[in-house]
């Protein structure tokens, strides 16, 4: 393999964020919550495999189309200036081709599911494509991101139970609010650059109330997940998981208190552990009732 081929391969890895799995994990945890809740324990193994692989593929596809949408802005933002497109390592048409390949493979997997899941997948694709452009038009693009990152929840219920009960939409709402909270932490890192470029974000919209609103969103997330536990008759392990997530949310508030870029980014990353704790609590609930 020559140097040019290696560089091109690395550029594709960077476009798909294979080297930065945090987004995949933040999408994966609520998907797993939904699968376990819908199945009342370990879900069907093929369904589990399809959703785990699908999460990886669609998160990568979302990152690819995001870089295409932001190709004229990323070079002016400190955090994103080194991405493949602003660096000229790949051409825009190559980025679109990679997105198409990832989306088509994902759709091929979805075709092995039932008709309700297939129907819901079209909305998932629409949300993935629309989100990157929202920061130009709406004051809180994180709302659309939250919908995109939560859409796997009704899809998981559809695939596992062929139904969309109330609890599916409660988990959807909890994850939507959580996504807005952690992506606001992420947006706090880029706030100054976004203001210069005229882009919109929840961090800009919330202004000096950002920390307080993040806290309210985190509390609402926990309360809704608490209601889910009550509706599903879940046991102590689940609530211990929620308590662990609550402790991490308090820690995140400490991290963002001075609004320093690196600390805000660390708070964002910490959400991976919060999602994992809720999932561990769910698994233990069904393993050790």
UniProtKB/Swiss-Prot annotation:
The chemistry this enzyme catalyses reads: all-trans-octaprenyl diphosphate + 4-hydroxybenzoate = 4-hydroxy-3-(all-trans-octaprenyl)benzoate + diphosphate
Q: Name one GO cellular component term.
A: plasma membrane
The UniProt record lists the EC number as 2.5.1.39
Any transmembrane segments, and where?
Answer: 21-40, 95-115, 116-136, 138-158, 161-181, 213-233, 236-256, 268-288
Pathway, per record: Cofactor biosynthesis; ubiquinone biosynthesis
Q: Which domain of life is it from?
A: Bacteria
Q: Which cofactor does it need?
A: Mg(2+)
Q: According to its UniProt record, where is this protein located?
A: Cell inner membrane
Q: What are the protein's GO molecular function terms?
A: 4-hydroxybenzoate polyprenyltransferase activity
| Biological processes, Gene Ontology terms | ubiquinone biosynthetic process
Top-tier EC class:
transferase
Q: Which Pfam families match?
A: UbiA (PF01040)
Q: Which keywords belong to this entry?
A: Cell inner membrane, Cell membrane, Magnesium, Membrane, Transferase, Transmembrane, Transmembrane helix, Ubiquinone biosynthesis
Q: Which family does it belong to?
A: Belongs to the UbiA prenyltransferase family.
Please give the function described in this protein's UniProt entry.
Catalyzes the prenylation of para-hydroxybenzoate (PHB) with an all-trans polyprenyl group. Mediates the second step in the final reaction sequence of ubiquinone-8 (UQ-8) biosynthesis, which is the condensation of the polyisoprenoid side chain with PHB, generating the first membrane-bound Q intermediate 3-octaprenyl-4-hydroxybenzoate.
Q: What is this protein called?
A: 4-hydroxybenzoate octaprenyltransferase
Q: Which organism is it from?
A: Aeromonas salmonicida (strain A449)
């Amino acid at each position: 393999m020559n140097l040019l081929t290696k560089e091109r391969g690395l550029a594709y890895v960077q476009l798909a964020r294979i080297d930065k799995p945090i987004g995949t994990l933040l999408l994966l945890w609520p998907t797993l919550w939904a699968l376990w809740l819908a199945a009342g324990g370990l879900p069907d193994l093929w369904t589990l495999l399809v959703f785990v692989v699908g999460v990886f593929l669609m998160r990568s596809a979302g990152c690819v189309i995001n870089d295409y949408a932001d190709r004229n802005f990323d070079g002016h933002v400190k955090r994103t200036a080194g991405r493949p497109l602003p660096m000229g390592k790949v051409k825009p048409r190559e980025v679109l081709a990679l997105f198409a390949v990832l989306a088509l493979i994902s759709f091929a997997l979805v075709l092995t599911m039932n008709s309700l899941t297939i129907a819901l997948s079209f909305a998932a694709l629409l949300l993935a494509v629309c989100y990157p452009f929202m920061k130009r038009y709406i004051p809180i693009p994180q709302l659309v991101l939250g919908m995109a990152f939560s859409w796997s929840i009704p899809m998981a219920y559809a695939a596992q139970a062929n139904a969309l009960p109330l609890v599916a939409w409660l988990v959807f709402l909890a994850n939507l609010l959580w996504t807005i909270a952690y992506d606001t932490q992420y947006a706090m890192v880029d706030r100054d650059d976004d203001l210069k470029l005229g882009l919109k974000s929840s961090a800009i919209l919330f202004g000096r109330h950002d920390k307080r609103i993040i806290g309210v969103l985190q509390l609402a997330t926990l309360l809704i997940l608490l209601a889910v536990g009550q509706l599903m008759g879940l046991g102590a392990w689940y609530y211990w998981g929620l308590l662990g997530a609550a402790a991490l949310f308090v820690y995140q508030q400490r991290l963002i208190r001075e609004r320093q870029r690196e600390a805000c980014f660390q708070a964002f990353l910490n959400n991976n552990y919060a999602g994992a704790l809720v999932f561990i609590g769910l698994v233990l609930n069904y393993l050790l009732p």
